[in-house]
Regions:
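Conserved HGGG/HGGXW glycine-rich cap/lid loop of the alpha/beta-hydrolase fold
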Residues: 1-48, 62
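Gly/Ala-rich beta-loop-alpha elbow adjacent to hydrolase catalytic centers
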Residues: 61-65, 69
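Flexible "cap/lid" loop of the alpha/beta hydrolase fold
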Residues: 74-75, 79-118
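Conserved alpha/beta-hydrolase catalytic His-Asp/Glu region
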Residues: 93-96, 111-168
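Short beta-strand/loop motif that positions the catalytic acidic residue
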Residues: 170, 176-178, 182
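Conserved alpha/beta-hydrolase "acid-adjacent" motif
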Residues: 183-189
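Catalytic histidine neighborhood in serine/cysteine hydrolases
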Residues: 191-210
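Catalytic histidine-centered segment of alpha/beta-hydrolase-like enzymes
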Residues: 208-221
Length: 234
């Protein structure tokens, strides 16, 4: 078996625990978790990832991690063997989204990062997958990232480029994954991406919210396994 390296990119306020189950399921593959806490732009995050990654690798990113993955595909498409874009969007922030991010930053500074995480928890997971244990994992990740990391990430998200015009130029095997009950990023974005990226495969997960790697660990691991098989074949 060709054990392709995979770089996993966490989302906003997420640590490697976002991919805990996938890391276990893909044992044997060299796995790296991208640093998404040190930089205040998506481009800088992508450049840091590329400096640290092997020559050729597969990529998966959830939410903000997907923004970084798309930027990696823009900067160094020749190094990416396959990509899984999960619970993410190719579009730039709307003014309303940006205003909400500034409000969350203010809440984090006033009430602490845990308060923000508990606020977000209500919208991050589907009712069918919500549990106290899952909520606590989400809060623990946020606490580990901390306020300054959160502010840098939000700045990166606010300033991210719109990648809509680039989707049709992507030449690597791409799997687009979304939860049908995602209340953060409309599943419609996944359909748009899959329809525009040549040869992209679309995986829609029923009764699943934004944190799909944690909500549907087995299904997501299977999707990543298939993506890695495409990378090895490519």
């Amino acid at each position: 078996v060709n054990f392709v390296s995979i770089v996993m990119i966490p989302g906003l306020l997420c640590t490697d625990d976002l991919y805990r189950d996938q890391i276990a399921a893909l044992a044997g593959h060299p796995i790296r978790i991208a640093d998404t806490t040190s930089d205040a732009s998506v481009t800088a995050m992508a450049e840091r990832l590329l400096a640290d990654a092997p020559d050729k690798f597969a990529l998966c990113g959830l939410s903000m991690g997907g923004y970084v993955a798309l930027e990696v595909l823009r900067l160094a498409p020749e190094r990416v063997l396959a990509a899984a874009l999960m619970a993410t969007s190719h579009r730039a922030d709307t003014p309303g989204q940006t205003a909400m991010r500034h409000q969350l930053i203010a809440t984090a500074r006033d009430e602490g990062i845990e308060a923000v995480a508990r606020l977000l928890c209500e919208r991050l997971v589907a009712p069918e997958t919500a549990s106290a244990a899952l909520r606590e994992r989400i809060v623990r990740m946020a606490t580990a990232i901390g306020i300054e990391g959160f502010v840098r990430q939000q700045q990166a998200i606010i300033d991210r480029p719109d990648q809509s015009d680039r989707l049709s130029t992507i030449k690597v095997p791409v799997t687009v994954v979304a939860g049908e009950a995602d209340a953060i990023i409309p599943p419609e974005r996944a359909r748009e991406m899959a329809a525009t990226i040549p040869g992209a495969r679309l995986e829609m997960l029923p009764a699943t919210g934004h944190m799909l790697t944690m909500e549907r660990p087995d299904r997501t691991s299977e999707i990543l396994r298939r993506s890695l098989a495409m990378a090895a074949a490519g």
